[in-house]
Amino acid sequence: MPKLKTKSAVKKRFKLTASGKVIASQAGKKHFMRRRTKAQIRNLRGTTILCPQDGYNIKKYFLPYGIN
């Protein structure tokens, strides 16, 4: 049986930490930035850890070897 492939879209958008949590970049920073304050824009930088249920769904359905 051949190896399962990882979904390319998920591979580009998410990463797993050593403890198994899922990291994603902050959402909501593509457009409509002019109506946001500088503090809001600053808070959208970087990455965030997904909530446990969302992380579980990403690992279960899109990363074939993500859940042991």
Curated annotation (Swiss-Prot):
SUPFAM superfamilies: L35p-like. One of its GO terms (cellular component) is cytosolic large ribosomal subunit. It comes from the Bacteria. The keyword Ribosomal protein applies. InterPro entries: Ribosomal_bL35, Ribosomal_bL35-like, Ribosomal_bL35_CS, Ribosomal_bL35_sf. Keywords: Ribonucleoprotein, Ribosomal protein. Pfam families: Ribosomal_L35p (PF01632). One of its GO terms (biological process) is translation. GO terms for molecular function: structural constituent of ribosome. Belongs to the bacterial ribosomal protein bL35 family. This is Large ribosomal subunit protein bL35. It comes from Rickettsia rickettsii (strain Sheila Smith).
